[in-house]
Regions:
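Active-site capping/gating regions of soluble enzymes
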Residues: 1-119
């Protein structure tokens, strides 16, 4: 297990649930499930953004981190939540490359800051 990295979704309310999960609930519930069920000798845990908005994914990541410490490193493995703002800024126009790059870096920085949110 020491060489395994677990790639998981955050614990969120289902699509048919009337009330979306708050970042506080996502953080507490996700941390609880991981601490109770994931072996401590794992190499790390990485989170998917799982269809969340860019902001939701970052806010939820910060709240999960606040519910640490964890016995393994925790980080993000977002695709859409990092790429969408950059792709939107680029809009298929190479003249927008620098703006797209800045949008991508802004999301990376926001998520890196979320990982510093230890409680």
């Amino acid at each position: 297990m020491r060489a395994c990295i677990l790639k998981v979704n955050m614990v969120l309310a289902g699509k048919n649930y009337d009330t979306p999960s708050t970042p506080k609930v996502v953080g507490e519930t996700t941390a609880k499930v991981l601490k109770e069920h994931v072996p401590t000798d794992l190499a790390g845990v990485v989170f998917l953004s799982g269809g969340q908005t860019v902001e939701q994914a970052t806010d939820n990541l910060a709240k999960i981190e606040k519910n640490g410490p964890f016995p393994w490193p925790v980080t993000f493995s977002f695709a859409r939540a990092l790429q969408d703002p950059a792709l939107y800024a680029w809009a298929g126009n190479n003249a927008n490359t620098d703006t797209a790059r800045q949008a991508f870096l802004a999301r990376l920085k926001a998520n890196a800051e979320a990982l510093k949110a230890q409680g």
